[in-house]
């Protein structure tokens, strides 16, 4: 069993009903998806069932990023990186749907980073957090 690291503000999404509700909030098929903090990949796997065009996973925890490689899917690209330093705009020329079970300890910083740049750059179409 994988334990959440408090130092990284981790919390893992495991309730299948909540995962279903989250995934059903926006159309996923043929869209590009960025998932922030995919953790154990429960939400990732459900999103993949809905056939996104491409899926980008940004996971800071090296152990979890490595374990996500078990999701053997050509549409998935895994980045073992810190979302606060990550350049989301470099992923695609298209707008991306963002899913995230954000780490509690940096959620304000993440949102501030994204919202600050909204005036000049609309790199995402939806935020499902």
Description of each model-found segment:
Residues 1-129:
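Catalytic cores of RNA-modifying enzymes
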């Amino acid at each position: 069993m994988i334990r959440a690291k408090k130092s990284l503000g981790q919390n893992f999404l495991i309730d299948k009903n909540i995962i279903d509700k989250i995934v059903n909030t926006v159309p996923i098929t043929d869209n590009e998806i960025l998932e922030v903090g995919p953790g154990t990949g429960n939400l990732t796997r459900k999103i993949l069932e809905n056939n996104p065009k491409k899926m980008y996973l940004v996971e800071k925890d090296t152990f979890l990023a490595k374990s996500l490689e078990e999701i053997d899917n050509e549409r998935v690209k895994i980045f073992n990186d810190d979302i606060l330093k990550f350049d989301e705009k470099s992923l695609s020329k298209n707008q991306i749907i963002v899913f995230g079970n954000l780490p509690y300890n940096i959620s304000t910083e993440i949102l501030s980073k994204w919202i600050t740049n909204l005036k000049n750059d609309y790199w995402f179409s939806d935020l499902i957090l």
